[in-house]
A protein has these predicted regions:
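Alpha-helical transmembrane segments
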Residues: 14, 35-43, 85-88, 113-117, ...
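Alpha-helical transmembrane segments and their helix-start/interface "positive-inside/aromatic belt" motifs
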Residues: 28-39, 156-166, 368-373, 453-462
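Hydrophobic alpha-helical membrane-insertion segments
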Residues: 35-48, 165-174, 375-383, 462-475
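Cytoplasmic/organellar membrane-interface segments at the starts of transmembrane helices
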Residues: 235, 366-371, 421, 428-489
Length: 489
């Protein structure tokens, strides 16, 4: 297969999004068909690339001597590309009903397609320079998704999102400069890390930590997490879903590439970099859960939940062992499914009823049973209830913590994960219970069915079903992630 196929999932949606401003669709249906066709084609190309190719690579051009724009589809790239393109497709389908009365609908889709292409480039980047270039593009192009409503609150949130993104990117850029100088080249991703970097000076440790912190901004890691709860309540529900479920994972991918494919896990194991990383991750897990527990605005509660849940991933990565690494990658997938389901469910409720508070949702299970059943399944998955997929990832994370060899983390990690799971139950289960069991004094006669159309329901059902299926049969994913772990550890 021609290696130029790597450019298709990147250029197709970017070109389609840019051209969207030139097309005049007389009917919304034709606009939706256009957007869906592009997203479906991108997802299909990513799946075919993952299944039918080994590890194709493509060097486009040199920026400076020894610094190239280079793409390569290794196993990790394929996992992230398939995840992002498929979830992007489902969120796009969901948005057709959510935005059907929005005057800025076409502008939203143009930006949405462009961001999807930039994310594909991010996944397929073959070196740290290429990754960083598209990481910056992603931050800039995704900001209008937050800004979409053009209210005072959305403008403030968009500026905050961009400020935090740029600040994190500058921290990461410092690390890239140092590692590029020490490594003497383009910092191509190599499983296990680059030997040139591992033989470098002590300042390399600080550079690596700056990259963890910088890319961790996008993942919502403390202390640079504040953009998440600001951006989610003001963004349209489809944008909130992908910000939480997908764009945060771009930060996770940056950390994985920097630590496991450039620095090398062995290089930082047992150093202050690992210990501080573990501490920051556990603090964020607990803090995010506490803030979510106290929050009364539904989408903001889910945003704080993302701060906590993505830090489960960061915690697993910080332990630098196979079980924790597998658990972290599993949680990347499973959190994306659950959190997209939750945000889309919340968006459906807001769209149909106008209710935005966590204490306003009594009886919504009677009004919108399919939506709220999907919401409930996703909630149980995030809590970690078997046989849903969240249980599997958290099992591997706890196992990795016990095997970490870090005396405090060995017992403190599972304890904090358990406390966080209880807090997660505390802020999600009451919503589900009041939705289906509002109490004997509730006025059922005033309720009317407000279930959305299949365009909203199909993505919700698909992701909720996957949360069950992958929880019962996780073996295929576990084997794939174990192969990646064996290569980098």
């Amino acid at each position: 297969m021609n290696n130029y196929i790597l450019l298709l999932p990147v250029l197709l949606p970017i070109a389609a999004g840019a051209l969207l401003s030139l097309f005049k669709f007389k009917e919304k249906k034709k606009l939706h068909i256009y957007v869906f066709a592009v997203l479906a084609a991108q997802a299909l190309i990513c799946i075919l690339t993952a299944v039918l190719t080994d590890a194709p690579s493509l060097m486009l051009f040199s920026v400076f001597e020894g610094i190239t724009v280079y793409f390569r589809a290794d196993l990790l790239s394929k996992v992230f590309a398939v995840l992002i393109s498929c979830v992007w497709l489902l969120a796009g389908l969901y948005s057709f009903e959510y935005l059907e009365h929005d005057e800025k609908e076409r502008l939203f889709y143009g930006i949405y397609l462009i961001v999807g292409g930039v994310l594909a480039a991010l996944c397929l980047a073959g070196n740290l320079v290429t990754f960083y270039i598209f990481y910056e593009f992603m931050s800039i192009t995704s900001m209008p998704l937050v800004l979409h409503e053009r209210t005072h609150e959305s403008v403030f949130a968009a500026i905050k999102y961009l400020f935090y993104s740029m600040a994190g990117a500058l921290l990461a850029l410092f690390g890239i400069f140092v590692l590029s100088y020490e490594g003497g080249g383009s910092l191509e991703f190599t499983a296990g890390g680059l030997a040139a970097v591992q033989n470098a000076s002590p300042i390399t440790f600080f550079a690596i930590f700056m990259m963890i912190l910088g890319f961790g901004v996008k993942a919502g890691m403390f202390p640079l997490h504040a953009w998440l709860p600001a951006a989610h309540p003001v963004a349209p529900a489809p944008a909130s879903a992908v910000l939480s479920g997908i764009i945060t994972k771009a930060g996770v991918l940056g950390v994985i590439r920097a630590v496991y494919y450039v620095a090398g896990a062995d290089f930082i194991r047992g150093t202050w970099v690992q210990y501080v990383w573990v501490i920051l991750s556990l603090v964020t897990v607990f803090m995010g859960s506490m803030l979510a527990y106290k929050e009364k605005v539904l989408k903001k509660r889910l945003a704080y939940s993302t701060v906590s849940q993505v830090s489960y991933v960061m915690f697993g990565l910080s332990l630098l062992n196979a079980a924790a690494f597998v658990g972290a990658l599993l949680h990347v997938i499973f959190h994306s499914l659950a959190k997209n389901t939750l945000f889309m469910g919340a968006g459906a409720v807001i769209h149909k009823t106008g209710k935005t508070g966590t204490d306003e949702l009594k009886g919504t299970g009677k009004q919108m049973p399919v939506v709220m059943w999907c919401f409930a399944l996703a909630s149980l998955s995030l809590i970690g209830i078997p046989p849903l997929c969240g249980f599997v990832s958290k099992w591997y994370l706890a196992l990795g913590s016990l095997e970490s060899g870090i005396s405090t983390a060995s017992w403190l990690g599972p304890v904090i994960l358990l406390v966080s799971a209880l807090l997660t139950a505390g802020y999600l289960l009451p919503i589900c219970i009041s939705a289906f069991l509002p109490g004997k004094d509730f006025d059922y006669a005033s309720l009317e069915k407000k279930e959305p159309s299949w365009r909203m329901l199909l993505p919700l059902i698909a992701m909720a079903a996957l949360s069950v299926i992958l929880g019962i049969w996780p073996g295929g994913l576990v084997n794939i992630f174990a192969d990646i772990a064996s290569a980098v550890l």
